[in-house]
């Protein structure tokens, strides 16, 4: 379904009132965007994507099929969410003692250009650093530094990646072979040379 706001919504998708969707965004089959959600421009939401109440999604974000972005999760610009990856938003869920409402949610922030592989799980209350790469099937239970490469269950850092997601190494002075990145105090900084 095309609309006056210059974004595309498939006829099977549901967009609740008070959801805000940016221009040139595409929302595909059987997706549901809940009230108060904000989705930026140029995003792509695959089939069966659920975006919860009051979720904030930046510009140029790609969310693959079968992903739920629950209330309490924020995705900055250029984030990639692989197929069937999982966000949680409550640390100790109990059916007998419902925990509805934002006061129970632990916030999760996925920073600019981070990528999360298929079937990965991001446990709530953590921050995924910019340009970080989370391997398929990983379970992230703690904060992830910028440019970190994480794999496994629980997710362990096995290296560093550049802005393009290619693994990089560092010499004794903490410089990458290309000279564009510096590792200091277990933090990678971009030197602005690319």
PLM features: what roles do these ranges have?
Residues 147-166:
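Conserved beta-strand-loop-alpha-helix hinge in the C-terminal portion
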Residues 129-132, 145-147:
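Conserved catalytic segment of ABC-fold P-loop ATPases
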Residues 170-174, 184-187:
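Short Cys/His-rich "knuckle" micro-motifs
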Residues 3-5, 11, 16-21, 26-127:
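Flexible, glycine/small-residue-enriched loop-and-beta-strand segment within the central core
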Residues 162, 176-178:
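Short cysteine-rich clusters marking metal-coordination/redox-active sites
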Residues 112-113, 130-131, 141:
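P-loop NTP-binding/switch modules centered on Walker-like glycine-rich loops
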Residues 182-194:
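Short metal-binding segments enriched for Cys and/or His
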């Amino acid at each position: 379904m095309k609309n006056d706001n210059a974004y595309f919504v498939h006829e099977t998708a549901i967009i609740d009132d008070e959801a805000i969707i940016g221009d040139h965004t595409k929302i595909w089959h059987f997706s549901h965007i809940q009230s108060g959600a904000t989705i930026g421009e140029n995003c792509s939401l695959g089939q069966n994507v659920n975006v919860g109440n009051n979720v904030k999604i930046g510009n140029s974000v790609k969310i693959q099929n079968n992903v739920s972005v629950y209330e309490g999760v924020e995705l900055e610009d250029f984030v990639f969410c692989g197929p069937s990856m999982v966000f949680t938003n409550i640390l100790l869920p109990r059916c007998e003692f419902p925990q509805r409402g934002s006061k129970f949610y632990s916030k999760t922030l996925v920073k600019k250009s981070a990528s999360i592989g298929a079937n990965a799980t991001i446990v709530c209350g953590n921050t995924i650093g910019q340009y970080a790469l989370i391997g398929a099937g990983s379970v992230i239970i703690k904060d992830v530094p910028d440019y970190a490469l994480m794999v496994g269950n629980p997710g362990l850092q096995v290296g560093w990646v550049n802005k393009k997601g290619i693994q990089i190494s560092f010499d004794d002075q903490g410089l990458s072979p290309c000279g564009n990145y510096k590792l200091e105090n277990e933090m990678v900084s971009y030197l602005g040379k690319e």
